[in-house]
């Protein structure tokens, strides 16, 4: 397949860095930093599309659906990174947010040649997950033309799922195929075609927003506290205690006691203290209010 890179923003040359190979190290890094500053502003222009995607993901979660990221190379790795942080941060099941990469798990560490060029592989990977209409697919590719991702997007649409994409080329096959196209224009890279740089940074910022926003919308955050955090190591055990203290203004002993009584479920401990009820009552009320702390507390008061 012949690929024309000439019209891709991510493949064009950046005049600002034409002489970067002649600069002293500090000046070189200042130039890279100056370009990086443009990324957040580019992402800002896409906030309405990001918000639309967040709401679709949150609705899918409420209906028992999943968020599936799919990409190749850096894009795939970033999706896997974001997905892998959801269980420890928000207490989600590993299958609720999943990252797929062209070439499978071995491609996380090493490039798998030609994997990204096969559309059918993208569809096959979704089929292996039993992807269905309740799920949301987010295709990730700086170029917006990766066949592996396009194949997955085509399959996802065929089963009636919501399909979004993140691409740094606004007029691309992916943006045309998606229901929701998130396309920050970050401009040419410092090193021509090195889309792991500004494009990758933009992707990471957007992925952060997608999962964080969806978790907030589904009750996983109270105030600005990660109240469903799982205590999987010593640091997170302490974080749980600090979250309970911050949310309730109780003392350390009270926080530890409440957490012990509810098997270390941070959200339940907070409701126990704020509402003055026991662990079972707190769990029952939280379930009734779909895991949201504020309406749970209001119902008691």
UniProtKB/Swiss-Prot annotation:
Active-site residues, as the UniProt record annotates them: 85 (proton donor), 116
Induction: Induced by MurNAc 6-phosphate that releases the repressor MurR from the DNA. Repressed by MurR in the absence of MurNAc 6-phosphate.
SIS domain ranges (all copies): 57-220
Pathway: Amino-sugar metabolism; 1,6-anhydro-N-acetylmuramate degradation; Amino-sugar metabolism; N-acetylmuramate degradation; Cell wall biogenesis; peptidoglycan recycling
Matches recorded under NCBIfam families: N-acetylmuramic acid 6-phosphate etherase, PRK05441.1, PRK12570.1
Role played: Specifically catalyzes the cleavage of the D-lactyl ether substituent of MurNAc 6-phosphate, producing GlcNAc 6-phosphate and D-lactate. Together with AnmK, is also required for the utilization of anhydro-N-acetylmuramic acid (anhMurNAc) either imported from the medium or derived from its own cell wall murein, and thus plays a role in cell wall recycling.
Other comment: A lyase-type mechanism (elimination/hydration) is suggested for the cleavage of the lactyl ether bond of MurNAc 6-phosphate, with the formation of an alpha,beta-unsaturated aldehyde intermediate with (E)-stereochemistry, followed by the syn addition of water to give product.
Official protein name in the record: N-acetylmuramic acid 6-phosphate etherase
Gene name tied to this protein: murQ
């Amino acid at each position: 397949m012949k690929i024309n890179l000439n019209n891709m923003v991510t493949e064009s040359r950046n005049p600002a860095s034409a002489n970067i190979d002649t600069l002293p190290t500090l000046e070189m890094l200042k130039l890279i930093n100056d370009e990086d500053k443009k990324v957040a502003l580019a992402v800002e222009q896409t906030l309405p599309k990001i918000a639309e995607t967040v709401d679709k993901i949150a609705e899918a979660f409420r209906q028992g659906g999943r968020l599936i990221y799919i990409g190749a190379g850096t894009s795939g790795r970033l999706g896997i990174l974001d997905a892998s942080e959801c269980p420890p941060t928000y207490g989600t099941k590993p299958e609720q947010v999943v990252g797929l990469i062209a070439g499978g798990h071995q491609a996380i560490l090493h490039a798998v040649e030609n994997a990204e060029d096969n559309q059918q592989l993208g569809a096959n990977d979704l089929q292996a997950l039993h992807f269905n209409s309740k799920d949301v697919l987010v295709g990730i590719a700086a170029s917006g033309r990766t066949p592996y991702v396009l194949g997955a997007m085509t399959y996802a649409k065929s089963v009636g799922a919501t399909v979004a994409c993140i691409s740094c080329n606004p007029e691309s096959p992916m943006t045309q195929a998606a229901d929701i196209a998130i396309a920050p224009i970050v401009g040419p890279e410092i090193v021509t075609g090195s889309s792991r740089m500004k494009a990758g940074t933009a992707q990471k910022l957007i992925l952060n927003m997608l999962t964080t926003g969806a978790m907030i919308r589904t009750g996983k955050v109270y105030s600005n506290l990660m109240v469903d955090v799982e205590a999987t190591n010593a640091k997170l055990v302490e974080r749980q205690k600090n979250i309970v203290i911050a949310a309730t203004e109780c003392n350390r002993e009270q926080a530890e006691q409440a957490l012990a009584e509810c098997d270390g479920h941070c959200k339940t401990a907070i409701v126990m203290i704020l509402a003055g009820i026991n662990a079972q009552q707190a769990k029952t009320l939280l379930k009734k209010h779909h895991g949201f702390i504020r309406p749970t507390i209001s119902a008691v008061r």
